[in-house]
Amino acid sequence: MKWFQTAILCVAIALTGCANTSQQSAQKWLYPPMAVPLQPSVQQEVQIARLSQLLQRPDLSDEVRAKMHYERGSYYDSVGLRDLARLDFNQSLQLNPAQPDIFNLLGVYFTQVGEFDAAYEAFDSTIELAPDNTYAERNRAIALYYGGRIDLALEDMTKHYQEMPTDPFRSLWLYIIEAEQNPEQAKANLQQRYLRDRSEEWGWVLVAIMLRDVSDEDALKAIMDGTRENYRLAERLTETYFYLGKRNQLEGDIASAISLYKLAISFNVYDYVEHRYSFLELAQIYDQLQQDRLAKLKAAKTLEIE
């Protein structure tokens, strides 16, 4: 059923992409399409309370206690309580260090807050413990990208992409990293991959948006029309607004990028990297704007002295 809905969505976007200019202008949104922000479920709250009670028992083995800390940390993470999740994950690792999934999650946390060296170490630990963990490969490449180590990021992401060229998210992140070195060539490469590998998988819609193969208005309308469940709409809009923000940022439209990253955050899809990395994107943009402002002030003072 999920595949069918995605196929319908892709067909809708393909059809709207062929609409004439007057139809497109009539479909512009006065306000950005939204979903109701996700809220913690009763099940999540009950599981956190249950695990907290069980962890108070003194007769638990280290193996069981480590597993419970991991489970409670995962629930904390799913409702946005990341500092509490991180504490639980660290406690779980103290009891059982051989947990690659926890190292991967900690690496994402470190990336989000800009602690890149710690992120690299966490992802390296994940890959050492689980060499086939493809999420850690991608996440390490992304951490290297945000940490400014573009050559290493490109090497990692190229290898990751080549392992599954039909994965649209691998294509997207390869493009984002390539664009740091050669924007025009990166876009041409993405266009080639899009024409060769695209399918009904949802992620290729995001590639089409990145390439402007479909207008933003038509894409958002198709997403709204083709998505019934609020949670699914929140997930898709989180991804859409993040990659729209990244596209606008790469094109130099920083003001729009800031607004779109804020929209990506607003749906509370805490376990999506697009939600997590929107915070990092905003922090890096604000840091750069502050540096630019200070540089202008310094230049102005230099002119006054002269």
Model-based region annotation:
Residues 74, 108, 142, 175-178, ...:
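Residue-level recognition of tetratricopeptide repeat
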